[in-house]
């Protein structure tokens, strides 16, 4: 409503760091733009517009390799020069790239559906008093949301611990109305400390699998 100009790009250190972007006038909401100049990007999928696949890219921005580590380099750059990002996404007919999540984070639904926890987390993180979250798959196959609430804001607004628990449950119910049946969150678990992160501020998901 305030017409604030912004855009979203996509990149990684190995690509110096830009892979794609679009100016704010032509930016397609939800995407991260089109391939940057002198870069080529494609989706490894039988149907790149509809079925997510790994995002691969090549061009002037791509690194020559990891310093003195040929094995690691060969693990991400193939013989044709394509750098395998490890990210999953789709690309529309105009070349706009939409990221779905990391390939290593993808979960399988009860009927083999691909579930991208980052997409669910993005919705949950925008809900009332949610600071950050992780969606994991329990041993029974159901999805569980681990939530670190914004305790400071909640307490400042007069909420109690019980109120916060009720609000997180209300968020779960509201979220389930926005996602597909196979993406439904069965229950939530509240954490009282911020999730541990890497130096790049990515949550160390592997530390929280025991919550299943």
PLM-predicted stretches and their roles:
Residues 41, 95, 124, 145, ...:
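Residue-level signal for inorganic ion chemistry
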Residues 41-43, 87-91, 135:
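A structural signal for short hydrophobic beta-strand segments in well-ordered beta-sheet cores
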Residues 51, 92, 98, 115, ...:
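Generic structural signal for well-ordered beta-strand positions
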Residues 1-27, 131:
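Gly/Ser/Thr-rich phosphate-binding loop
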Residues 35, 47-50, 54-109, 126:
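Conserved ATP-binding/catalytic segment of the ANL
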Residues 107, 132-134, 141, 172-212:
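Conserved C-terminal "lid"/linker of ANL adenylate-forming enzymes
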Residues 88, 126-151, 176:
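C-terminal boundary motif of the adenylate-forming
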Residues 114, 127-132, 153-190:
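Conserved C-terminal helical docking segment of ANL/AMP-forming enzymes
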